[in-house]
């Protein structure tokens, strides 16, 4: 809508009764969640949803730095009123798509080495079992240990790095190992919330995929399975996506807010130099913390310990993945893409 119309609408909303404002806010949140639910039903939609999640993470971080309220990003409309009709009504959607493509490619580079190693451990183990290749019996387990070890280290690092990438839009910061580990070390105990939330999401994913094996034996579902198996699968993943998206939003919110508060804490404790921050970080943080560029205190080995000590707590996330594949094998895609880590799509 034109700028004048937008301002008039905002003034009317401010004068509206609190009940009306609360109702419209709830309705808007429901519509946005419904769109996210629809996007999670396909790979292309999941890329768009990933871009939307990144913008949510950005807004959460900015809210921490500015002391403002979190505002969920729009799905379609442009943030500004300039441009033609098409731009004003679709700009956010295209921004989500561009952000999602960049995020998915960057995450693939970061996550696929451990995911491929874990997948190879599974296939190597089964092939060795079928063909009785006892002289290669250790190959599968050793690959599994290596892949899970890499995965646990990755998951200890990823939430902060992902939040930083989402907030700044700079993909290189996803691989800024030293700075990101310094940020992670700012919250050695608060970080325990992350593996708990991710494991809860992993259990949900395992349930959505694994329980599908037993669906034809449940009386309440037999009719739907026999009538139209394809439609049953569509409905199955759609309904499971509701709690999944809720947990996805919670996990990314926690990661973004921990990252944002870690920067403030690091500056206050002189563990991070103001000049090392990205331009976007300095821009938003200037109102929350007026601090000159100081000499940074060295971190060293102690920083690494504070950052990585919860690494073993990520093991249950990978255990749930193996258990789910034992119950209901969904192929290589199930190993390569964990919905809470890469593309937010359950199947």
Q: Residue spans of the language-model regions?
A:
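Helix-coil boundary and N-terminal low-complexity module in membrane systems
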Residues: 1-148, 152-199, 207, 248-347
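Membrane-interfacial helix-loop-helix connectors in multipass membrane proteins
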Residues: 122-143, 213-239
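Short catalytic/ligand-binding loop motif for oxyanion handling, primarily in non-cytosolic enzymes
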Residues: 202
